[in-house]
C-alpha cells in the first residue's frame, strides 16, 4: 500500500513539475515574443515614420532616437514627399555646408558689391543665415520658418552660433554642420542689420535702390530680411510673389526675425503647390519640422528625463499649465490664478476641491494619479495649486500632484543654464496629455506644436480682471503668426483661403488649420 501511495505521489509531483516547466517555457516564449515586438516597434518609432534619418551616432545625441520612448506615437504621419525632401536637403547641405569648397567660393563673392549677381553663376549653393534674436520660443519658431523657406527655395540654412544654440540643440543634419562659421565675412555686421540698415530689403525698396517689378535691378551678393514684429509695409513685401522672384536670385539672405511666418508662405502662389505636397495635413507643419530639427543636447535631455521619470512617468494622466504674465511689472496676480482655476475646472482638466472629507462620496471610484506640470517664472501659481489639493480632497477622488521644475523670476535669454532649463520645460510640456497655454506665448506655441497638442488658451486679462470666458480650445496645434501682413499683396488671399484663420489669441495674427 505504501509503495502504491509513493508511486502515485511521485507521478503527481512529476506532472506538476512538467506543467510548471511548460508554463515557464510558454511565459518565456511569450515574453521573448513580446519584447521582440516591442524592440521592433521601438526601432520603427525612433525614426518617427521616416522623418529622421538613421545616419547619426546615437550616443552623441540621445534625445534624437529616445524621444519616442517618452512620447505617445503621433497620430500625424509625415508625407512621403516630405521625407524625400528632407533626405534631398541633407545631401545638399553636405555638398554646400561649412568646410566645403562650394561654401568657400560662396563666401568669396560677399566682398564684391559692385557686381550684378543676376548674371553670375553661383552653382546650386545658395544660403540663408539665421540671426539669434529675442527669447528661446521666438528663436525656435523662426528657425522652423526659415528651414521651411530653405526647403522651398533650395537654400542651405546656417545658424548664428555666437549665442548658446550649440548648448541647446544637437546638429540636425548628418555629416555636416548647421553652425555658421565664426570667420564668416559678415559676422561683425550681423548685429547691425536692423530695419534702417541700407542692406535690408525693405530699406532698399523704400530708397529705390532695388526694384522687384523690373528686370533691370542689380542683384546684390546678399540681402537682409527684416521680419521683426515692428516691421513696416516695405519689409512685408517679402511675402509678395514678384518680390520673391527677385529675392530668389540673391546668393545670401540674412534673416532678422522673431516671428513664425509660415502661414504667409502658404499665401505665396508659387509655394502653395509644393507646400500642399509636403504637408497634406496643413496643421502639422510645425509639428513635423520641430520633431525633425530640434533635438536637445545630452545635458538638456538629462534634465528632461530625470524630471519626467521622477514626477510624471507614474501618473495616469498628465496636464501641462504654462503661465506667462505680460503685465509690467510681472509677477503673481490673483486674477491670473482665478483665471487658471476657472479654465481648468470648467473644462474638466482639474477637479474641484471639497472643504470637508465627508463630502467625498466616491473615494474608491477613482484613485487615479494626475500629474500637473506648471511652468512659470514665478513659484506662486504652482504653490497655490499644491496647497489647494493638499488641504482638501478632490471631487473626483483623483490624487493631484503638482510639479514646477524651476522658478527663475526673470527671463535671462542667452544665459546658458537658464535657456537649458527653458528648453527642458518646453519639452516636458510637450510630453503631457493636455496643455493649457498663455495668450500669444511663443513658449507655449512651441510646446503644443512639438507635442501635437491642441491647447486651451488663457485669454489675456484686461484691467487686472479674469476674462470671461477664461480660455478657449484652439482649433489647431499650429503656432500663430502674431504680426501677419493682413494688407497689401496678400489681403484678398487672407479672407478667401480656407486653411488660414485669424488666431484665437491675436486678431492681427494668422494660423494654419485643416480646411475641413
Curated annotation (Swiss-Prot):
InterPro entries assigned to the protein according to its UniProt record, in alphabetical order: XG_FTase
Pathway the protein contributes to: Protein modification; protein glycosylation
Keywords: Cell wall biogenesis/degradation, Glycoprotein, Glycosyltransferase, Golgi apparatus, Membrane, Signal-anchor, Transferase, Transmembrane, Transmembrane helix
Localization per record: Golgi apparatus, Golgi stack membrane
Biological process, per Gene Ontology: cell wall biogenesis; cell wall organization; protein glycosylation
Residue ranges that the UniProt entry lists as topological domain Lumenal: 26-516
Membrane topology: Single-pass type II membrane protein
Tissue expression remark: Expressed in leaves and stems.
Cellular component, GO annotation: Golgi cisterna membrane
Coiled coil: none
Pfam families for the chain: XG_FTase
Keyword Repressor applies: no
Membrane-crossing segments per the record: 5-25
EC number: 2.4.1.-
Residues with attached carbohydrate: 35, 116, 211, 362, 463
A GO MF label: galactoside 2-alpha-L-fucosyltransferase activity
Enzyme class: transferase
Family affiliation: Belongs to the glycosyltransferase 37 family.
Function (record text): May be involved in cell wall biosynthesis. May act as a fucosyltransferase.
Protein name per the record: Probable fucosyltransferase 8
Species for this entry: Arabidopsis thaliana (Mouse-ear cress)
Upper classification of the organism: Eukaryota, Viridiplantae, Streptophyta, Embryophyta, Tracheophyta
Gene: FUT8
Amino acid at each position: 500500500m505504501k509503495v502504491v501511495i509513493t508511486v502515485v505521489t511521485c507521478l503527481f509531483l512529476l506532472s506538476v513539475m512538467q506543467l510548471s516547466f511548460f508554463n515557464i517555457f510558454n511565459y518565456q516564449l511569450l515574453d521573448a515574443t513580446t519584447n521582440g515586438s516591442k524592440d521592433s516597434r521601438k526601432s520603427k518609432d525612433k525614426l518617427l515614420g521616416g522623418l529622421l534619418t538613421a545616419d547619426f551616432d546615437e550616443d552623441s545625441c540621445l534625445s534624437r532616437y529616445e524621444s519616442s520612448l517618452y512620447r505617445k506615437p503621433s497620430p500625424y504621419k509625415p508625407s512621403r514627399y516630405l521625407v524625400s525632401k528632407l533626405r534631398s536637403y541633407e545631401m545638399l547641405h553636405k555638398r554646400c555646408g561649412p568646410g566645403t569648397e562650394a561654401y568657400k567660393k560662396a563666401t568669396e563673392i560677399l566682398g564684391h558689391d559692385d557686381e550684378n549677381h543676376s548674371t553670375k553663376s553661383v552653382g546650386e549653393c545658395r544660403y540663408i543665415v539665421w540671426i539669434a534674436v529675442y527669447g528661446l520660443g521666438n528663436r525656435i519658431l523662426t528657425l522652423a520658418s526659415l528651414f521651411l523657406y530653405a526647403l522651398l527655395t533650395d537654400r542651405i540654412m546656417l545658424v548664428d552660433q555666437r549665442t548658446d544654440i550649440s548648448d541647446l540643440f544637437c546638429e540636425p543634419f548628418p555629416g555636416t554642420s548647421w553652425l555658421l562659421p565664426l570667420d564668416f565675412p559678415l559676422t561683425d555686421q550681423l548685429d547691425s542689420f536692423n530695419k534702417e540698415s541700407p542692406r535690408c530689403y525693405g530699406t532698399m525698396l523704400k530708397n529705390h535702390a532695388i526694384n522687384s517689378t523690373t528686370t533691370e535691378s542689380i542683384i546684390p551678393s546678399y540681402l537682409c530680411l527684416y521680419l521683426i514684429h515692428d516691421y513696416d509695409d516695405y519689409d512685408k513685401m517679402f511675402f509678395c510673389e514678384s518680390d520673391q522672384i527677385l529675392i530668389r536670385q540673391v546668393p545670401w539672405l540674412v534673416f532678422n526675425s522673431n516671428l513664425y511666418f509660415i502661414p504667409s508662405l502658404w499665401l505665396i502662389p508659387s509655394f502653395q503647390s509644393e507646400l500642399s505636397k509636403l504637408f497634406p495635413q496643413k496643421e502639422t507643419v510645425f509639428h513635423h519640422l520641430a520633431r525633425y530639427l530640434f533635438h536637445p543636447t545630452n545635458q538638456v535631455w538629462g534634465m528632461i528625463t530625470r524630471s519626467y521619470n521622477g514626477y510624471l512617468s507614474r501618473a495616469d494622466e498628465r496636464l501641462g499649465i504654462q503661465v506667462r504674465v505680460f503685465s509690467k511689472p510681472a509677477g503673481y496676480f490673483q486674477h491670473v490664478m482665478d483665471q487658471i482655476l476657472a479654465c481648468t475646472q470648467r473644462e474638466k482638466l482639474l477637479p474641484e476641491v471639497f472643504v470637508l472629507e465627508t463630502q467625498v462620496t466616491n473615494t474608491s471610484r477613482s484613485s487615479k494619479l494626475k500629474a500637473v506640470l506648471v511652468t512659470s517664472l514665478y513659484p506662486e501659481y504652482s504653490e497655490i495649486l499644491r496647497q489647494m489639493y493638499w488641504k482638501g480632497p478632490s471631487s473626483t477622488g483623483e490624487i493631484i500632484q503638482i510639479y514646477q521644475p524651476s522658478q527663475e523670476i526673470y527671463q535671462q535669454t542667452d544665459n546658458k543654464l537658464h535657456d537649458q532649463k527653458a528648453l527642458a520645460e518646453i519639452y516636458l510640456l510637450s510630453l503631457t496629455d493636455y496643455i493649457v497655454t498663455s495668450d500669444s506665448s511663443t513658449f507655449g506655441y512651441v510646446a503644443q506644436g512639438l507635442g501635437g497638442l491642441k491647447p486651451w488658451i488663457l485669454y489675456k486679462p484686461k484691467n487686472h480682471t479674469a476674462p470671461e470666458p477664461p480660455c478657449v480650445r484652439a482649433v489647431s496645434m499650429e503656432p500663430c503668426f502674431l504680426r501677419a501682413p493682413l494688407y497689401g499683396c496678400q489681403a484678398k488671399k487672407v479672407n478667401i483661403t480656407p486653411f488660414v484663420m485669424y488666431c484665437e489669441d491675436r486678431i492681427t495674427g494668422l494660423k494654419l488649420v485643416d480646411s475641413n
